[in-house]
Amino acid sequence: MSANRIAVLRGDNVSGIIRFKQEKEGSPTTISGEIKGLTPGLHGFHVHQYGDTTNGCISAGPHFNPYNKTHGGPTDEMRHVGDLGNIVAGADGTAHIDISDKHVQLLGPNSIIGRSLVVHADQDDLGKGVGDKKDESLKTGNAGARVACGIVAVSAAS
């Protein structure tokens, strides 16, 4: 049984549509779409704990982390389920997303349905921060402010 989900991201100047598809429980999830209005460069991209945007993106809570691990990069074994690394916005402020992730699940007990997808202002350091940035790096990747977010919702097959 395959699953299709969507997140419509909104922020003050940033917007986008992200689609999720998973063929069966335990298989990788494909994450694709486009986000506009970003500053050129790298931006942290994460699934957050709550599907709550009542107080903007801050209501989304911390990164989705059902296994209580430290923050890491998308290819690290030690990472939050929600750690999707960085997306890249071009000179026009548009980021094209095409990710396949084995940790993000649409089916099963740790589904991301109803949780929030957040894009951040800054580059995610992937848990590799040093010195006075190390503690925050292991929680958030020092990715900065939340510039847009949306709730992962059920969508029609596409």
From Swiss-Prot:
The keyword Glycoprotein does not apply. It is found in: Cytoplasm. One of its GO terms (molecular function) is copper ion binding. Its EC number is 1.15.1.1. It comes from the Eukaryota. It catalyses: 2 superoxide + 2 H(+) = H2O2 + O2. Zn(2+) binds at H63, H71, H80, D83. Destroys radicals which are normally produced within the cells and which are toxic to biological systems. PANTHER family: SUPEROXIDE DISMUTASE CU-ZN -RELATED. Homodimer. Belongs to the Cu-Zn superoxide dismutase family. This is Superoxide dismutase [Cu-Zn]. It comes from Brugia pahangi (Filarial nematode worm).
